[in-house]
Amino acid sequence: MSSPRKVRGKTGRDNDEEEGNSGNLNLRNSLPSSSQKMTPTKPIFGNKMNSENVKPSHHLSFSDKYELVYPEPLESDTDETVWDVSDRSLRNRWNSMDSETAGPSKTVSPVLSGSSRLSKDTETSVSEKELTQLAQIRPLIFNSSARSAMRDCLNTLQKKEELDIIREFLELEQMTLPDDFNSGNTLQNRDKNRYRDILPYDSTRVPLGKNKDYINASYIRIVNHEEEYFYIATQGPLPETIEDFWQMVLENNCNVIAMITREIECGVIKCYSYWPISLKEPLEFEHFSVFLETFHVTQYFTVRVFQIVKKSTGKSQCVKHLQFTKWPDHGTPASADFFIKYVRYVRKSHITGPLLVHCSAGVGRTGVFICVDVVFSAIEKNYSFDIMNIVTQMRKQRCGMIQTKEQYQFCYEIVLEVLQNLLALY
């Protein structure tokens, strides 16, 4: 079920949120760690994790062109470094743009829309009423037996102490994982990584083109009750990898991109703005043109619709870009409500190819999204689910998925809220 300037990589292991520090942008050989504060470290390539295997957890069931800035680090709130964003091209870009823009995620009115050529295929408007309805996940079968089983599931979750959840996360941290990071560690690919220790496994990395070129992205397949949920988890594009990113979108026939970060958070650049911000001017690359067709800004996420045109053939593909803008600078959202609605809208929008998800490093918030999306699908189909098992599967396919204990706890909080809201209706 399917569901050109360079920056140095950093490490993301010890970060709480999704980004980290920076070093001297002119130090080509420096790959600072996200666990450090302001001082870059010596390059260390690779991230071998050896330990005991994770133990099974209780199975829960309720069922019988514009080069602007240098992007920044990973999913954590422990790193306080800021990239240099004083580039004149950045200032000139924003000073010269027309008023019809849908670029950086900034504070806006609750509803703002724009369009160059609105059609049924590119309509982006979404009402809060629709989102509220989407958040009310309803199982296929919800008779008295199913409701009773769901209450049992809810009770089991509610009885889990915070310490139990933390213990689960610590077990996940001790998993023995693959150690095949050869592609990401080659000299020609090191500058394509945002962090030196967040690399895709060779076995699950997303290859580009006939030559199987490198991008820091991983295929993630989660199996639950014989159903497979298919994703691409990737880091936020760097200036030098933007065209690679769009190539990946086209080659994998992805019709949805879920972006779970703002471009700048707490003064730190989290992700390079890789899309056109004007309805009148496309973003041009060597092989592709990206057009902004329409956009719609809600209180907590922005919808953009792009047409990506391959210059050699003239073929185009429509892609919906959904950017969640209410994840706080540090920690996790205080309320799960906005994120639940966002995840459900992303799932509703998905049609073809793997669902492409990214934050900054493509592991922390990205992991939370994938985990709860799988659980929501399980609830809809009256399937049992096991959060620890889902995260275990993710980590076997991309290192560090769900980076912090706070993010792991947030998954439980989200699921609890969904189940409580569902049972309250009956």
Swiss-Prot record:
Annotated Polar residues bias: 95-117
Residue ranges, compositional bias (Basic residues): 1-10
Subcellular localization(s) per the UniProt record: Nucleus; Cytoplasm; Cytoplasm, Cytoskeleton, Microtubule organizing center, Centrosome
Binding residues annotated for substrate, in chain numbering: 329, 359-365, 403
Catalytic reaction equation(s): O-phospho-L-tyrosyl-[protein] + H2O = L-tyrosyl-[protein] + phosphate
Low complexity bias (residue ranges): 21-35
Pfam families, alphabetized: Y_phosphatase
The keyword Lipid metabolism appears for this protein: no
Active site: 359 (phosphocysteine intermediate)
Residues with PTM Phosphoserine: 76, 127
SMART domains membership: PTPc, PTPc_motif
Main enzyme class: hydrolase
GO-annotated molecular function: protein tyrosine phosphatase activity
Chain segments carrying region Disordered: 1-58, 95-124
Tissues and organs where the protein is expressed, per its UniProt entry: Testis-specific. Specifically expressed in testicular germ cells that undergo meiosis (at protein level).
Domain named Tyrosine-protein phosphatase: residues: 165-418
Keyword terms of this UniProt record: Cytoplasm, Cytoskeleton, Hydrolase, Microtubule, Nucleus, Phosphoprotein, Protein phosphatase
EC numbers: 3.1.3.48
Any GO CC annotation of this UniProt entry: centriolar satellite
Similarity comment: family membership: Belongs to the protein-tyrosine phosphatase family. Non-receptor class subfamily.
Function summary: Tyrosine-protein phosphatase targeted to sites of actin polymerization in response of varied extracellular stimuli. Has tyrosine phosphatase activity towards various tyrosyl phosphorylated substrates.
Record protein name field: Tyrosine-protein phosphatase non-receptor type 20
Chain's gene name: Ptpn20
